[in-house]
Amino acid sequence: MQNQLNTLLQSAKKSVADAQSEIVLEEIRVDYLGKKGKLTELLKSVGQMPADQRPLLGKAVNEIKREIQQLLNAKSTQLREKSLQEKLNKEKVDITLRGRYDHLGAIHPISRVSERVSQLFSMLGFQIAEGPEIENEYYNFEALNIPADHPARTMADTFYFSGDKLLRTHTSPVQIREMEKQGVPIRLIALGRVYRRDLDQTHTPMFHQVEGLVIDKRSTFANLKGLLQQFLNCFFEKDVRLRFRPSYFPFTEPSAEVDIYQPRTDKWLEVLGCGMVHPNVLRNLNIDPDEYSGFAFGIGLDRLAMLRYEVTDLRLFFENDLRFLGQF
């Protein structure tokens, strides 16, 4: 019996040592320690031995059973560690490789400028108004004292739909609509996209504009100049030099264009138009021009962005080149 036990133990040791997977190891356990296993069969035969030998043989069988179980446990741990190491080696990261970076989005420079302009005018007591981009001729032209024979109303300058529908050429129609709803006095700005048939280094068919309007009983051109100077100083965070040049707009009288001085190039760049609201515009809204007066101004947000970020070509803002937009 003892020889059988020793032979069985050596056979189990070899089988466990040769096992290369948990599945094979489980088969070995069943083969030796299962209900019908080799060691279990030997344990059953102990009862047939002489009574004085049974305790010693039973003890020997249990010791071999315990040793085989320890061999199985040790081999199982070894196989799990080996499997884990192989998995880690497959998933190993080469830290010498160049990393993969996610491209983070950013706020478009025009949107940045638009938000900044809105905040500054809100601080100056202006309300923010919006209106439709598809307008009719009355709000875009007639209510603003632009007659039918005015050059701005030709198809060479304006995008027309059928009938009297068109893409608005400025945000002034928003001011007319708000005065119809609110009456006067009023103090507001209107921001948004506007459309004109123009394309060069400083013009695009679609651009962004903010127009301001103040109607009160004692509004003067001096108020207008002071407001624009204060706004532009705040926007550029420094004192800027402005030049007011006499100009003509159908909806303001007197009118002026405003240039801002660029020290870097020693040149002046036009940034906005302004003037006192024309009496005819007030009359169109049943407002007495002898009692009320006001001023209006229109600023190209794209021009402001060009100046703030020192961009020389306006079209760069609309070409969706991430190399350019990623700089802001």
From Swiss-Prot:
GO terms for molecular function: ATP binding; magnesium ion binding; phenylalanine-tRNA ligase activity; tRNA binding. Its cofactor is Mg(2+). It is found in: Cytoplasm. Keywords: Aminoacyl-tRNA synthetase, ATP-binding, Cytoplasm, Ligase, Magnesium, Metal-binding, Nucleotide-binding, Protein biosynthesis. It comes from the Bacteria. Binds 2 magnesium ions per tetramer. This is Phenylalanine--tRNA ligase alpha subunit. It comes from Coxiella burnetii (strain CbuG_Q212) (Coxiella burnetii (strain Q212)).
